[in-house]
Amino acid sequence: LAQLRDACALVQHVSRLVHQLQKERGLSNLYLASAAAQGAGALSDQAQAVNGSVATVRAALEAQSLNLSGGHGARLFSAIAYLLQGLDALPALRERVHAQALPVDQSTAAFVRLIAACLAVVFEAADSACDPDISRLLVAMFHFMQGKEIAGQERAAGAAAFGSGLSDVARQHHWLHLIELQDGCVQVFAEFAPASPEMRGWEDVEQNPAMAVIERLRRVACTAREGERLDAALGERWFAACTQRLDAMHRVEGHLADELVQLCERKLAIACSVLASQQVLLREEEEKEKENEKEEGEKEAEAGSVHST
């Protein structure tokens, strides 16, 4: 349980890093698709925000890697190692984005791989949970994070579409697929999430005014004919509306992570209390056994003395 508590704390840090990386991915797409006409200043600021989260996660990963054991521990260690490789490659990716030296699709794919490495750490932490209550909450959180990641991919796809100023049928199909995948993740989340304010918080996200903007811009982009002009100025409006939604989702995610750590702490406290009680009972049994042995010894000595007399 102590290992699981530490793993859940790691999930908190990884969740924050994913949120920052998702935003950098979207801004990178806006920057590349608009030929650096949009998003340059925000992208630079966002890189600094990501760097702060990376430093926190590196410290947490280093601490976590020292306390891994067993088969689940080996898989979590492998996921951590893969994530660290991805983080090491991030500066080179940024240089290519800044120099506009790679297509939007390649930039998106690189960020998707890095975020997938983050989610793999969360998945392995969830897979290592032996307590059913903790496991259930971890499954709910993993699917919520996965749904949020797909929503982040939709933000990036829309930023690229509007930034380019042209409709593309292949991108439209991919866009609609992302919407469908989000719905699937939310269904699993709803199945495993506890009846709590976090669940109601998700319902509030879907009723946020930003969703009306997102729905309208989805229709604009996904119903346009192949090669039809899209208003490039809508790119920043799309990005802002999606960011409002993703920020709200991140708050729900944060509540889930806090509840997860608190649940681990409660379970650990109960386990420690039970263990302490068992140790007290064991000591009492040992003391009784010693007293019985002493009494038996005294009786034997007394019997021997009588026999000699």
Predicted regions located by residue number:
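Hydrophobic alpha-helical segments
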Residues: 1-309
